[in-house]
Amino acid sequence: MNYNDPLEPAMIITKVLSKSDIVGNVVLPKAEVMSVLTRMNVNDQDLLNGVEVQVDDIMEDDLYTVTLKVSGIDKPKYYFGTGWSTMKHSLDLSEGDVLKLYWSHLDNKFVVLNFQYSVLPLMIPV
């Protein structure tokens, strides 16, 4: 992924985490996931069984493997199952936090966009 190129808004998934997302599996916004799925090489049957995807935290240099699944046919719900618990604890996520992921179709993985910006103090020589 070239981090100097602008991000495609259609490849971003944003979710404000609820208590149930923290206690169990995180349910992802349907419209945003469906937009990302246009670039992933998966079909409905793959998602029913679960597809392992990588999630890259480039700030901490951590790579997570989570299972992206769908439940239900009439009203599908997309969620991260296996691997989500490890990822949420490592990212120190809690209720009310915003999870923001970018699907990098060239790298075939999600990239965490939850950057914690910090400013180094200005050092003035005396």
Curated annotation (Swiss-Prot):
Q: Where in the cell is it found?
A: Nucleus
Cross-referenced Gene3D superfamilies: DNA-binding pseudobarrel domain
User: One GO term of the cellular component aspect?
Assistant: nucleus
Output the superkingdom of the source species: Eukaryota
Keyword Transcription regulation in the entry? The reply is yes
Can you provide one Gene Ontology molecular function annotated for this UniProt record? DNA binding
Does this entry carry the keyword Methyltransferase? no
Q: Which UniProt keywords apply?
A: DNA-binding, Nucleus, Transcription, Transcription regulation
Q: What is its main location?
A: nucleus
Q: Cross-referenced CDD domains, in alphabetical order? A: B3_DNA (cd10017)
- What InterPro entries does this protein map onto? B3_DNA-bd, B3_domain, DNA-bd_pseudobarrel_sf
Annotated region of DNA binding = 20-118
**Could you list the residue ranges forming a coiled coil in this record?**
none
Q: Which PANTHER family match?
A: TF-B3 DOMAIN-CONTAINING PROTEIN, TRANSCRIPTION FACTOR B3-DOMAIN FAMILY-RELATED
What name appears for this protein in its UniProt entry? B3 domain-containing protein At5g54067
